[in-house]
Amino acid sequence: MDAVQELEHRITELEIQSALQEDVIAGLNAMVAELRQTLDLQQAQLRLLYQKMQDRNPDAQEPYSLRDEIPPHY
């Protein structure tokens, strides 16, 4: 191979690597966006649960106890 062919080969290899990296980055970006949505949903659920706990007994001096949540079949 002469120098020009070697350079063309190297450029082709770099273009292939770049295309593969772009594909991986796009996949990772989609995954991060999905995880962000999941995190936002979980944070909203946690805020709702916290608000429900506060609404149940807003003036209580003692912490919330799971013993207050005995299932109805007991």
UniProtKB/Swiss-Prot annotation:
Recorded hits in PANTHER family, A to Z, give: PROTEIN SLYX (PTHR36508:SF1)
Q: What is the species listed in this Swiss-Prot or TrEMBL entry?
A: Neisseria meningitidis serogroup C / serotype 2a (strain ATCC 700532 / DSM 15464 / FAM18)
The name this protein carries in UniProt is Protein SlyX homolog
Describe the family membership recorded for this protein in Swiss-Prot or TrEMBL: Belongs to the SlyX family.
> Pfam families under this entry?
SlyX (PF04102)
What is the gene name?
A: slyX
**Domain of life from the UniProt record:** Bacteria
